[in-house]
């Protein structure tokens, strides 16, 4: 089970990296946050694994609306814990 979740996490990271390299370059910069949502997603998946990473990604995307000011929102060292697959 752990191996399967790790493989899924790596596949998602690969998809996001392909998006960054081949699709994102044609879009104008729109992200309200630093790092961008795609960089945040890769960092969350790499640091926390699939389950907690997806939860953090969902929370980040839900913050992306005109009424949120954006700003610096990275995965801090304090929030890093053991990787949960």
Swiss-Prot record:
User: Is Transmembrane found in the keyword set?
Assistant: no
Keywords carried by this UniProt record: Cell membrane, Membrane
Q: Give the record's membrane topology.
A: Peripheral membrane protein
Its primary localisation, in coarse terms, equals membrane
Question: Which Cys pairs are S-S linked?
Answer: none
Q: InterPro entries from the xrefs?
A: Membr_insert_effic_factor_YidD (IPR002696)
One GO cellular component, as annotated: plasma membrane
Q: Where in the cell is it found?
A: Cell membrane
Question: Per its database record, what is this protein's job?
Answer: Could be involved in insertion of integral membrane proteins into the membrane.
Family, according to the entry, reads as follows: Belongs to the UPF0161 family.
Q: What is this protein called?
A: Putative membrane protein insertion efficiency factor
Q: Which organism is it from?
A: Buchnera aphidicola subsp. Baizongia pistaciae (strain Bp)
Lineage here is: Bacteria, Pseudomonadati, Pseudomonadota, Gammaproteobacteria, Enterobacterales
